[in-house]
Regions:
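Short hydrophobic beta-strand element within catalytic cores of glycosyltransferases
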Residues: 329-332, 342
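Carbohydrate-associated surface elements
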Residues: 184, 205
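Conserved acidic donor-binding segment of nucleotide-sugar-dependent glycosyltransferases
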Residues: 344-345, 349-356, 365-370
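Membrane-proximal helix-turn-helix segments that form the acceptor-binding/catalytic region
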Residues: 138, 157-177
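N-terminal subdomain of nucleotide-sugar transferases
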Residues: 1-63, 67, 408-409
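Short alpha-helical donor nucleotide-sugar binding micro-motif in glycosyltransferases
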Residues: 172, 291, 299-304
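Aromatic "clamp/platform" in nucleotide-sugar-dependent glycosyltransferases that forms part
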Residues: 312
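Conserved donor-binding/catalytic core segment of Leloir-type glycosyltransferases
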Residues: 218-236, 242-248, 254-256
Length: 409
């Protein structure tokens, strides 16, 4: 099968600079590699966002990357918003159509809403089925933001979200099929008018060869270790975790993510969080690592007794899944992918957000029972390997492709 994977603002060839340890670019590379391993030809179409990125390149056998010039590279933000991407959709979709007219794919898979807009425009009249995957829905983001409205560091609606809110339902209804990354997203898509029969749940996967219980472990200092991965912008959930830490004696917290370590002193969010930790009297038990490269995450995750998710909205729960794959139980809020991935009381704990006293109680209970943590860790590894390996995700993705190509025949 010839697969066209449209990812306007992601490329497995040249991952964007970013503050988080889990990037869409990396997952995209894993998915395409597994699809190619099963004998399919994959072409990733991405927007050229750096001057030194080649127009064409082979990622690995069976996977080619095409970077499309959709305007001046200098005008593309490092983390572009809706307005930046929407403005470039026509310049992105035109070349796509020309390429597909001469080299027609069997199926198109679009990642994110602007990619879907470009893919649908390019595939129009060519008879190519389009599979849409939103990765993140504005309706869910706005719901998460509403829960923390007017609180510092809360998720805020994108400046161009009006266009996104208006267009996401139309994109979902126009696609041949829609891939949801978690169960809650199915209900959100249905509320937008997307027919449930066209929706299939295919979560984001985990590299179970890299994220394993066995392997190097980051150095510890004798204290029980808690870890959270965040870009530091969502301060309110982090403040909740810091408050909980005051009631968990002799435990340390690693805050992984944000700008590079050398740039932390110049980061406003870091400064406010570090000051807050000092005010609480726990600065000596809180370490901000700054940005950590993807390959360096497994040793850190293995070194933690527990990983706590502080995300207000997390469609895929990627870092939580990575922790579980390393045998580290997760404490997470009941949002997005966590509701599917974390089995409450078996692989970790689901806990309501903004409840520092309850969080502290749960942390103390678990840290006082190392054997329970170990049991959760064993179950977590089994959960990830059986449900979230990229081999399985690729197989489920191909099942969606087979369905839409059969219907289009």
């Amino acid at each position: 099968m010839k697969i066209a994977l449209v990812a306007q603002n992601a490329t497995p060839l040249h991952p964007r600079a970013g503050s988080g340890p889990d990037r869409d670019d990396i997952g995209l590379g894993e998915l395409t590699r597994k699809l190619a391993d099963q004998g399919h030809q994959v072409t990733v179409y991405a927007q050229k966002n750096l001057a030194d990125v080649p127009d064409q390149a082979e990622l690995h056998a069976g996977v080619r990357v095409e970077h499309i010039d959709a305007g001046p590279v200098a005008g593309i933000a490092t983390e572009p918003g809706d307005a930046d991407l929407l403005e470039r959709v026509p310049a992105f979709s035109g070349p796509l159509r020309s390429l597909w007219e001469s080299d027609r794919p069997d199926v198109v898979h679009a990642l994110a809403w602007t990619s879907g807009l470009a893919a649908l425009a390019a595939a129009r009249d060519l008879g190519i089925p389009v599979v849409q995957e939103f990765s993140s829905l504005s309706v869910a983001e706005r719901r998460a933001a509403a829960g923390f409205r007017d609180q510092p560091g809360a998720v805020k609606a994108d400046g161009a979200s009006a266009a996104r809110i208006r267009l996401e339902p139309a994109i979902g209804r126009s696609a041949s099929a829609v891939v949801a990354t978690n169960s809650a997203e199915v209900s959100d898509l249905a509320s937008l008018g997307v027919h449930r029969s066209s929706i299939r749940i295919v979560p984001w996967g985990v590299d179970t060869d890299l994220f394993t219980p066995e392997g190097p472990v980051a150095k510890r200092n004798g204290r029980q270790r808690l870890l959270t991965a965040t870009d530091l912008t969502q301060r309110k959930p982090l403040e909740t975790l810091l408050r909980a830490l005051t009631k968990v004696s002799d435990a340390e917290l690693l805050v992984v993510g944000g700008p590079a370590e050398a740039e932390l002193p110049r980061d406003d969010n870091y400064a406010k969080l570090a000051k807050f930790a000092a005010t609480l009297g726990i600065a000596d038990r809180v370490t901000f690592t700054g940005k950590v490269e993807y390959a360096a995450m497994p040793p850190l995750l293995r070194s933690a007794d527990l990983v706590i998710s502080t995300c207000q909205y997390e469609p895929s729960g990627t870092t939580s899944l990575q922790a579980m794959a390393c045998g580290t139980p997760v404490i997470a809020p009941p949002v997005g992918g966590h509701m599917d991935a974390v089995v409450d009381g078996t692989t970790g704990i689901i806990i309501p957000p903004d409840r520092p006293a309850l969080l502290a109680q749960r942390l103390r209970q678990l840290l006082a029972h190392p054997m329970l943590i170990e049991a959760y860790g064993v179950a977590a590894v089994d959960r990830v390997r059986s449900r979230y390996s990229w081999d399985r995700i690729a197989g489920e993705t191909l099942a969606v492709y087979d369905r839409v190509t059969t219907q289009a025949a």
